[in-house]
Amino acid sequence: FPANRLITQFNITNDSLEFWINDRKRMPDTLHVFVDYMKTDTLGKLTPFTEHIRMTMENSGGKSKSSKRNIKHEDTTCVMTVKAEPERVEQYGFEMEFNFPLIYEHFDSVKLTSINPRQQEAKMKFSVTRDSLNLRKYVLMPEGKLMSGYEYKLKVPHRMFRDINGFYNDSSEVKVSLPKDDKLSSLTLNLTGVNHKYIVDLLNEQRDKVLRSYIIEKDSELLFPYLKEGKYSV
């Protein structure tokens, strides 16, 4: 297949590769993949090596009528998830992730609305950025400061996105507000003597989730709001 028909993505450690074939033609029974890389030989030296991988398509000819009737709605839909966490929406916005890469996108039709305490609605502008590590994920970041007591609603109309399988999305709507719990606290870090670029992460006690992250290159005051009682790591 030509390069323009392939969608590829390496994982964060650059040792695994995902690829999708963007071609509506009938696929052959066996896909031959040739991978060129440097391999250690018997003398411990790195030498060029080509590995031939045969990927055989699953046999679908014997499917019964009953199995076809068991096809779920998500099997014929561009499946996506849209989420926004109250504690993180100021920095991370609304996150949209699709099960498969997109071949058609229409973010201009997505609507972001703010609703004030008087239930008055106003349209908001937002920017769209594709995640640098996951090409199936997009971040929709509201422009302007988010206000406590307001509700923010993101509405995605149907048939605005089409994935590599040719399926369109269903409509979706997500609402979020900034936390208002009086028991929440905030942490402020004053960093001095900074003369290089640093990434400062606040993690939970298990250190398996980044709650908020900053990239700094000079002395900075970093705010970590909406913290529940507990232990954290920086």
Residues covered by each model-derived region:
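N-terminal targeting or signal-anchor segments and their processing/structural boundaries
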Residues: 1-234
